[in-house]
């Protein structure tokens, strides 16, 4: 990578990002702007994918809200996310958990591991 681009992106990286992987349940505190007000909206769900590297790394969180699956994708190093809390660590054998989209109820559960 170009040294100039690398030096610019190093200043943008966040240092408070916890260690989480697909299968983990996280609580994302996202800043939402409504008109002139800004508030924190909490989005809690299972991390189904993590892709990219460096400043452009992204992760997708899936939750069930009102019986409907909702997915949101966040950049890891964005200032729009106040904090990321890891609630529990899940035991999975895949890097991408897109198969959870087709499962419902107890079939969509992920076994918890203690780390």
UniProtKB/Swiss-Prot annotation:
Keywords: Ribonucleoprotein, Ribosomal protein. Pfam families: Ribosomal_L19. InterPro entries: Ribosomal_bL19 (IPR001857), Ribosomal_bL19_CS (IPR018257), Ribosomal_bL19_sf (IPR038657), Translation_prot_SH3-like_sf (IPR008991). One of its GO terms (molecular function) is structural constituent of ribosome. The keyword Ribonucleoprotein applies. GO terms for cellular component: cytosolic large ribosomal subunit. GO terms for biological process: translation. The keyword Ribosomal protein applies. This protein is located at the 30S-50S ribosomal subunit interface and may play a role in the structure and function of the aminoacyl-tRNA binding site. Belongs to the bacterial ribosomal protein bL19 family. This is Large ribosomal subunit protein bL19. It comes from Streptococcus pyogenes serotype M49 (strain NZ131).
């Amino acid at each position: 990578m170009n040294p100039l681009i690398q030096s610019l992106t190093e200043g943008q990286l966040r240092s408070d990002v916890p260690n989480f992987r697909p299968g983990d349940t996280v609580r994302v505190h996202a800043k939402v702007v409504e008109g002139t007000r800004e508030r924190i909206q909490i989005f809690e769900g299972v991390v189904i994918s993590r892709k990219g590297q460096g400043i452009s790394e992204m992760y997708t969180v899936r939750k069930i809200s009102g019986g409907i699956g909702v997915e949101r994708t966040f950049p890891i190093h964005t200032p729009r996310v106040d904090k990321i809390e890891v609630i529990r660590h899940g035991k999975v054998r895949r890097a991408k958990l897109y198969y959870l989209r087709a499962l419902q109820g107890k079939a969509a559960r992920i076994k918890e591991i203690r780390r």
